[in-house]
Amino acid sequence: MKKVEIKKKTIKELNIELMNLLREQFNLTLQHSAKKLQQSHLLQHVRRNIAQVNTILAEKEKECD
């Protein structure tokens, strides 16, 4: 997901996106531990997306205060 797309979302949408990414990370981690994950780079992409969403979310919450 691109930063431009993330910045356009509202705080509520970002929280929903964050929950979806955390769920996806959990599922990928389980697959990785069971040695069923063929594309291990997906785990890194999800982690990066979580960090981006958290950063933008913190910026937006700081703007509101």
UniProtKB/Swiss-Prot annotation:
Query: Which SUPFAM superfamilies does the record match to this protein?
Result: Ribosomal protein L29 (L29p)
Q: Please, one GO biological process term?
A: translation
Q: Name one GO cellular component term.
A: cytosolic large ribosomal subunit
What is the name of the gene encoding this protein? Answer: rpmC
Q: Belongs to which family?
A: Belongs to the universal ribosomal protein uL29 family.
Protein's UniProt keywords contain DNA repair: no
Source species, domain of life: Bacteria
Any one Gene Ontology MF annotation carried by this entry is: structural constituent of ribosome
Protein name, as recorded: Large ribosomal subunit protein uL29
NCBIfam families (UniProt xref): L29 (TIGR00012)
Any single Pfam family the record assigns to this protein: Ribosomal_L29
Question: InterPro entries recorded for this chain?
Answer: Ribosomal_protein_uL29, Ribosomal_uL29, Ribosomal_uL29_sf
Organism the protein comes from: Buchnera aphidicola subsp. Baizongia pistaciae (strain Bp)
Keywords for this entry?
Ribonucleoprotein, Ribosomal protein
Listed CDD domains: Ribosomal_L29_HIP (cd00427)
